[in-house]
Each structure stands twice: as C-alpha cells, then as structure tokens.
Amino acid sequence: MSGGKSGGKAAVAKSAQSRSAKAGLAFPVGRVHRLLRKGNYAQRVGAGAPVYLAAVLEYLAAEILELAGNAARDNKKTRIIPRHLQLAIRNDEELNKLLGHVTIAQGGVVPNINAHLLPKTSGRTGKPSQEL
C-alpha cells in the first residue's frame, strides 16, 4: 500500500500560465504590477489593480491604432506614421481631450481653414442676366 489518503488518479501537473493569459490580455500584467510597486504610487498594490490597468492600457492602444490605421488607409498608405497618429487623435473628441497637451513629434497640424477666409461663392444658380 502506498502512503497517503487520496486514492484515484494522480494529480496532473498544470503548466504555468501568465496573469496576462488568465485575463485574456496582450499587455503584460506582471510588468505593470512591478512598475506599480516600484513607482511609489502607494505602499501596497492589490492583485486586481495591475490587471485592470493593463486592460485599460490595451484598450486605449487598440483604439488609437484602429483610428490611425483608418487614417493611413484614407491616405492610401500601409504603414502608420506619426502623422496618422496625430490625425487620429485630434479628430476624435474624447482622445483629443485626453491627450490635449501631448505633442506628437513629426505629427504636423490638423488641416483647418476658418470659414471667413474661404472665398465667397455667389448665390446665383446660373440664370442669365436680362441686360443688353
């Protein structure tokens, strides 16, 4: 007889799974946790805080990259450059508010011409004049 109470099947060893994989995230939960601990933001850091923060950062990155990809496609380009990031952020109301004081290197400016500076179009629709 073998020692131990439990009979039946032997316990199958589980392979190690990262916290990012458990949460279904691409961003590194372990690294975010380490940065929160080393950053002196608080004396203690809960277990759920780095998971939540990594999820928020992943969502923001995905949102910005999707809009920048659309801007690149509109300009018939396949590579996202800083100009596309600038256009994506400045044309989105919420992202512009969040990143309002951020300067993007090589981003340029958003094209905008004041309506007063545009040439005035005539209101006539092409009726011939009655003058001789």
UniProtKB/Swiss-Prot annotation:
The modification Phosphoserine is found at S129. Keywords: Acetylation, Chromosome, DNA damage, DNA repair, DNA-binding, Methylation, Nucleosome core, Nucleus, Phosphoprotein. InterPro entries: Histone-fold, Histone_H2A, Histone_H2A/H2B/H3, Histone_H2A_C, Histone_H2A_CS. A motif ([ST]-Q motif) lies at residues 129-130. The modification N6-acetyllysine is found at K5, K9. It is found in: Nucleus; Chromosome. One of its GO terms (cellular component) is nucleosome. Its main location: nucleus. Phosphorylated to form H2AS128ph (gamma-H2A) in response to DNA double-strand breaks (DSBs) generated by exogenous genotoxic agents and by stalled replication forks. Phosphorylation is dependent on the DNA damage checkpoint kinases rad3/ATR and tel1/ATM, spreads on either side of a detected DSB site and may mark the surrounding chromatin for recruitment of proteins required for DNA damage signaling and repair. Gamma-H2A is required for recruiting crb2, a modulator of DNA damage checkpoint signaling, to DSB sites. Acetylated by esa1 to form H2AK4ac and H2AK7ac. GO terms for molecular function: chromatin-protein adaptor activity; DNA binding; protein heterodimerization activity; structural constituent of chromatin. The modification N5-methylglutamine is found at Q106. GO terms for biological process: double-strand break repair; heterochromatin formation; homologous chromosome segregation; mitotic chromosome condensation; mitotic DNA damage checkpoint signaling; mitotic G2 DNA damage checkpoint signaling. The nucleosome is a histone octamer containing two molecules each of H2A, H2B, H3 and H4 assembled in one H3-H4 heterotetramer and two H2A-H2B heterodimers. The octamer wraps approximately 147 bp of DNA. Interacts with mdb1 (via BRCT domain) in vitro; this interaction requires phosphorylation of this protein at the S/T-Q motif. Belongs to the histone H2A family. The [ST]-Q motif constitutes a recognition sequence for kinases from the PI3/PI4-kinase family. In contrast to vertebrates and insects, its C-terminus is not monoubiquitinated. This is Histone H2A-alpha. It comes from Schizosaccharomyces pombe (strain 972 / ATCC 24843). The gene is hta1.
